[in-house]
């Protein structure tokens, strides 16, 4: 049986036993802060077992995708460690118990999987003789039953439900280990007796102090590893040698001269074992990365995003060890991974995220090599590399420790391991004491802060003169600094990233020098920490000024989120819950559960409702009240009540007569200031969860519609060309020929009309521009053509970008409209991906913006070195 057949067989079997089949849920937990990832089949059903929610049935079964990264170093080394896996489960909540669970298990392994009865073994808790006798009643011999102790066969985690468990093992034979049943009896790790199914009998309630009372409602919780079952049925030495992994491994082989050899499990060639491990690590890690990104997570320096970044970078390094020189490369594995699993998502979007992360890491590799080469050239007589610098390379730059070691060994230089471990321990200790939301990296010096000291005044004020209470770099508190600093002020108007709203931007000024606010986040006490770069002294006050345009954008989209949430509940019912939101100055996203994807008609209803709220011109109120009062006015509790330190002083954002929401963000004074509202997309984020993206304000929506129009025109041009090139060369019967001929002629007529309309539109746009297209000269940079003009008016920059792009489709067109503090800039091309160009240059210049493949627009502070960079350092990629 292949993996797809086994998964289907499990679900079909339990459906035939009247189990409700629970669809696989997102890897990202919903309203469960105790989990970083969904890590088991039962993790998505916790609310049913706790009684918080009513289950759809007393009997349930699933095949749940899961992530565990606590044993990442074992992946690729052992036969069965994975970061991503599927857990098959069957569950009973107050329904059947031991007898039925054991009968179902017996029937499935013998009649469905067709496993050899004589090769099955079962462990059970030594006091649980009922379970032992139930296995015997199924025809198994006593010598196939192994008693276990509390450590091996009693499931208990602190207080709460607990009970004995029984495990099913399969003996794969002497070729995997000549030692016999003693392996299982003594709980020795081995590759012969493989656990395939664990059945937990939730029987008692523990008080955590060794006292147990029997539960009124007894439950069954089981887990069977799909990868393990597949390896047994396919007689594969390891899980990696099955149809779940081999297609991915074979795809990797296309890019390297090295080969993965299954037979090496038995031959045990040391060099080949190492090579095999590289293939396994890449295949495993990229399964995790692809599925996590598909469920809505993205690589970053925080939380789940940090894990994805680490897995991608670890895979990237293993690709280097396989001498894979084509970079980026990992993103090319997305399609084969998707084909091996039953989950639906946009593989192109997932690949784009991975590719972007690979490009970013390739720059990190270059930076790390520069630092190492500099040390080697300046310290040619030294044979020991500072361990703290090696750790900084790893932690700050993400440069793999193994690569540092490899490069240095070529020069007979060793790393001071003692210093490395000390630096690592120091970092871990600081991380343990910090849980700041919105932090872009670990800042050890924040451990020096011991209490809440600041005051947020940003609801009432957007500027202030403030005193610096703490001036920090990453390690220490300072009296002055010239570089990256983290400030805590006595009072601040800057909102910190929280509640789905991005932080304020703006500047602080000291002694006539303005420093841009790069980030604002809260430490564990709730102090606002401001990140800036430049010269500062703790001895002088600072003038704070919030960027009012960005603040207004944030307010629009946060208020727009509340109004859209209200509209969604009006259209779909009060069962709609907010599962997540993200608001910045440009757009908003909102995650909510739906039975099926909302239709265009339903989305239009939501959009029109929000527009009606705008037209009502309703004032916003901030109300402070207790939780009971909040419930009386039907305030929507979009945040967990427990997150509020004082439930008697909840902050309610009230648009009277429309919606009242528990919220700590900044909002518009009146709904009319939203101006306009448009939902731009609805996409599936996970099973039963959809992400809605929307924008607000007339200017933003006009820009969006213009971009859409430009894209549509390009699509039409391509379609026209394709239709004109079509050869209608086929035979038809006489009766059909007249009708077909008429239809073909109609298509041709419409094509010609569309073609003329597009040409006229381009001609019309061309008349509006202020330069002569025939006088444009392209610059040749190593076979790549560039047109850069910084004397364009802001009003015509967008129109002109499109016209020049059509005239010179193989060139990169960069137009700039000069400004005092910053300049407007556009990138347009049919050959080069415009938004990727913008993103790449943003890594080297103070540049921000957005767009699409054929047109991207933004703003840039200093572009004086832009052309030089494009000539000397930029990697031109189609």
Curated annotation (Swiss-Prot):
Cofactor note: Binds 1 zinc ion per subunit.
Matching SMART domains: tRNA_SAD
GO cellular component: cytosol
Domain of life: Bacteria
Protein's UniProt keywords contain tRNA-binding: yes
Leading EC class: ligase
Entry's Gene Ontology BP terms: alanyl-tRNA aminoacylation
Entry GO MF terms: alanine-tRNA ligase activity; aminoacyl-tRNA deacylase activity; ATP binding; tRNA binding; zinc ion binding
EC number: 6.1.1.7
Chemical reaction(s) catalysed: tRNA(Ala) + L-alanine + ATP = L-alanyl-tRNA(Ala) + AMP + diphosphate
InterPro entries to which the protein is assigned, alphabetical: aa-tRNA-synth_II/BPL/LPL (IPR045864), Ala-tRNA-lgiase_IIc (IPR002318), Ala-tRNA-ligase_IIc_anticod-bd (IPR018162), Ala-tRNA-synth_IIc_core (IPR018165), Ala-tRNA-synth_IIc_N (IPR018164), Ala-tRNA_ligase (IPR050058), Ala_tRNA_ligase_euk/bac (IPR023033), DHHA1_dom (IPR003156)
Major subcellular location class: cytoplasm
Residue positions binding Zn(2+): 558, 562, 663, 667
Subcellular location: Cytoplasm
UniProt cofactor(s): Zn(2+)
Pfam hit, one: tRNA-synt_2c
Keywords: Aminoacyl-tRNA synthetase, ATP-binding, Cytoplasm, Ligase, Metal-binding, Nucleotide-binding, Protein biosynthesis, RNA-binding, tRNA-binding, Zinc
Comment field on protein domains: Consists of three domains; the N-terminal catalytic domain, the editing domain and the C-terminal C-Ala domain. The editing domain removes incorrectly charged amino acids, while the C-Ala domain, along with tRNA(Ala), serves as a bridge to cooperatively bring together the editing and aminoacylation centers thus stimulating deacylation of misacylated tRNAs.
Family: Belongs to the class-II aminoacyl-tRNA synthetase family.
Its biological purpose: Catalyzes the attachment of alanine to tRNA(Ala) in a two-step reaction: alanine is first activated by ATP to form Ala-AMP and then transferred to the acceptor end of tRNA(Ala). Also edits incorrectly charged Ser-tRNA(Ala) and Gly-tRNA(Ala) via its editing domain.
Official protein name in the record: Alanine--tRNA ligase
